[in-house]
């Protein structure tokens, strides 16, 4: 079951802010980020368990660069708490940037959240 209490060193979920304007001036949204938003809607307690940051579309994305490096600006990303047990990461594509472990993409993020917080797992 998802705990409503945030950990002292919480995982940090980075999502593109919804309804952004791209370089051509079109209103857009990120489908992968929308999938993760849907997961947060299904399991609202995840919002209390995670630190969630909405990032603007334009690059460079300073907050993302500071956390996981310039080469890793694709979102969604979940920056893992330093104390994350390695057994929760089995078979997930864990990446490293700026000394931090992170996951990218809704499927990996969803599987991790299920293991860590007890939400449903992607099927």
Located regions from the model:
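GST-like domain detector, emphasizing the conserved glutathione-binding G-site
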Residues: 2-123
């Amino acid at each position: 079951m998802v705990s409503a209490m945030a950990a002292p060193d919480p995982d940090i979920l980075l999502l593109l802010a919804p309804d952004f304007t791209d370089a051509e001036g079109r209103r857009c949204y990120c489908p992968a980020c929308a999938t993760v938003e849907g997961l947060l809607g299904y399991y609202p307690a995840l919002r209390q368990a995670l630190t969630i940051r909405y990032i603007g579309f334009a690059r460079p994305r300073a907050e993302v660069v500071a956390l996981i490096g310039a080469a890793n600006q694709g979102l969604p990303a979940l920056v893992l708490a330093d104390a994350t047990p390695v057994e929760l990461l089995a078979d997930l594509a864990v990446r490293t940037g700026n000394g931090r472990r992170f996951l990218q993409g809704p499927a990996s993020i969803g599987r991790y959240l299920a293991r860590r917080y007890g939400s449903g797992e992607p099927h």
